């Protein structure tokens, strides 16, 4: 059986002006009673309006016609009402409907919603999928929901300023408002359109972004300023404006990271503080009691030269719960975070247990954690440990290959065991979290000294430890010991 809606008297009264009202109204919250059974499903067919391909650089009208009701199976004489118009599933927009059922929207609002939907001001043709929530009231007064099709149109935002080949600078309270004090932003290594400035400031500050072409010695061409459409914008994440640009406010002090995306024309301001140490405690470690005890707070290893990132190999029993902290005590601690990949959740059965990170599947895991400001990432991966270098499967010609993997024990007190060395030479061992490139394996390497696992962490090259053909490495991550024999 199909469904229809029976509307209240208040909704019926509204229909008299909804079909022909030219004012821009936002009817995103229709009033209705619960649906009841109906003998048939009524439909509405919509088509794109005459303004189905909008280019903002060429547009001159204040409003545009984006859709039209072309037909309906509602009873003849029914009055049609539209309750909401939604773009790309999540964005409602004010609209008007003419007497011949043409839907009009303000062009400026449509442009703004398009940019918000794609989080971008880039002058790229964007598809907008329009869903129209429509109803019919029959001559007998019955209100029935209409099922309609989706309509697609396109909009291309206005052209943004060209990327300055010489980059961008920050000028503001914490630099000084002159050209000589401007601080250059660094181009991101992976995104040629992303520019970054890391700074440490004493108090919240206003700033603007300038292309290099705007700075000539101590002089600044203020007409080229980039900022926010709202002066003093402290949102931390918004679009960049190039006309009448207002100042952006950091809303933070201390270590901050300012980013400017010169393609999408967005900025971010983030807390850039990061711990130099990280510890894990939990149900298997007496929940951090006593403070400072290495058996209650398990230290993770820094990823060499990589701010705020750590790793460790740990055994978890089923349903163990853990938290992390930047010291071997409570304070600024965290457990389950949103930035855990589905792959990690599936591998280890990870879940949120009252804010704690719960591990549902017992076993050994390589745990990778990144903490920079409020941005926290936790990943659980297979505990792959590799033999590297002279003694490995094919020396330096084959790295991080299956033939160099250590075996993984099935118990918490078991040993990881390497393949037998194929020749004499310096022994090198590493893990390789997915966030660390294969070529940077040395950032997560370690060796054995005097029967103990010695992690490189943020240190330099470790002293060479020699191995002989046929020997193996034995590692006990549970108690931190190891041997070569």
Curated annotation (Swiss-Prot):
InterPro entries: SusF/SusE-like_C, SusF_N. A lipid is attached at residue 20 (S-diacylglycerol cysteine). Residues 275-383 are annotated as: Carbohydrate binding module (CBM) 2. One of its GO terms (biological process) is starch metabolic process. Keywords: Carbohydrate metabolism, Cell outer membrane, Lipoprotein, Membrane, Palmitate, Signal. It is a lipid-anchor. A lipid is attached at residue 20 (N-palmitoyl cysteine). Induction: By maltose. The keyword Lipoprotein applies. GO terms for cellular component: cell outer membrane; outer membrane. Changing residue 396 to A: Abolished binding to starch. It is found in: Cell outer membrane. Changing residue 20 to A: Abolishes cell outer membrane localization. Starch-binding protein present at the surface of the cell. Mediates starch-binding before starch transport in the periplasm for degradation. SusE and SusF do not constitute the major starch-binding proteins in starch degradation pathway. Has lower affinity for starch compared to SusE. This is Outer membrane protein SusF. It comes from Bacteroides thetaiotaomicron (strain ATCC 29148 / DSM 2079 / JCM 5827 / CCUG 10774 / NCTC 10582 / VPI-5482 / E50).
């Amino acid at each position: 059986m199909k469904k229809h809606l029976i509307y209240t008297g208040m909704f019926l009264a509204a229909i008299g002006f909804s079909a022909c009202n030219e004012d821009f109204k936002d009817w995103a919250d229709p009033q209705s009673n619960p649906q009841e059974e109906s003998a048939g499903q009524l439909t509405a067919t919509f088509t794109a309006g005459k303004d189905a391909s909008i280019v903002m650089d060429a547009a001159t009208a204040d409003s545009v016609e984006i859709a039209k009701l072309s037909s309906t199976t509602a009873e003849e004489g029914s009055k049609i009402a539209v309750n909401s118009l939604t773009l790309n599933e999540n964005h409602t927009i004010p609209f008007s409907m003419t007497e011949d059922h043409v839907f009009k929207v303000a062009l400026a609002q449509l442009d703004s919603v398009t940019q918000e939907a794609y989080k971008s001001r880039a002058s790229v043709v964007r598809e907008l999928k329009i869903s129209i929530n429509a109803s019919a009231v029959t001559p007998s007064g019955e209100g029935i929901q209409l099922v309609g099709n989706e309509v697609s149109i396109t909009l291309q935002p206005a052209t943004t300023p060209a990327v300055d080949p010489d980059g961008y600078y920050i000028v503001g309270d914490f630099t000084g408002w002159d050209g000589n004090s401007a601080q250059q932003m660094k181009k991101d290594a992976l995104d040629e359109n992303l520019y970054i400035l890391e700074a440490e400031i004493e108090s919240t500050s206003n700033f603007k972004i300038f292309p290099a072409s705007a700075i000539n010695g101590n002089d600044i061409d203020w007409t080229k300023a980039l900022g926010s459409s709202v002066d003093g914008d402290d949102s931390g994440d918004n679009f960049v404006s190039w006309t009448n640009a207002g100042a952006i406010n950091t809303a933070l002090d201390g270590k901050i990271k300012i980013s400017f995306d010169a393609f999408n024309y967005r900025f971010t301001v983030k807390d850039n503080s990061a711990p130099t140490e990280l510890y894990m405690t939990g149900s298997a470690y007496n929940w951090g009691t006593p403070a400072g005890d290495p058996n209650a707070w398990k230290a993770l290893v820094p990823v060499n030269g990589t701010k705020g990132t750590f790793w460790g190999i740990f055994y978890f029993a089923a349903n163990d719960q853990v938290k992390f902290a930047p010291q071997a005590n409570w304070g600024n601690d965290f457990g389950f975070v949103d930035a855990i990949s589905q792959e990690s959740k599936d591998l280890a059965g990870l879940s949120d247990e009252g804010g704690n990170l719960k591990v549902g599947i017992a076993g050994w895991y390589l745990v990778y954690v990144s903490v920079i400001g409020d941005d926290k990432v936790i990943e659980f991966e297979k505990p792959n440990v590799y033999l590297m270098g002279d003694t490995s499967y094919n020396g330096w010609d084959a790295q991080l290959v299956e033939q160099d993997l250590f075996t993984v024990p099935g118990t918490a007190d078991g040993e990881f065991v390497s393949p037998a060395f194929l020749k004499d030479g310096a022994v090198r061992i590493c893990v390789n979290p997915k966030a660390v490139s294969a070529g940077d394996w040395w950032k997560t390497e370690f060796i054995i000294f005097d029967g103990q696992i010695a992690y490189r962490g943020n240190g330099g090259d470790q002293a060479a430890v020699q191995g002989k053909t046929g020997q193996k490495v034995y590692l006990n991550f549970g108690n931190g010991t190891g041997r070569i024999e």
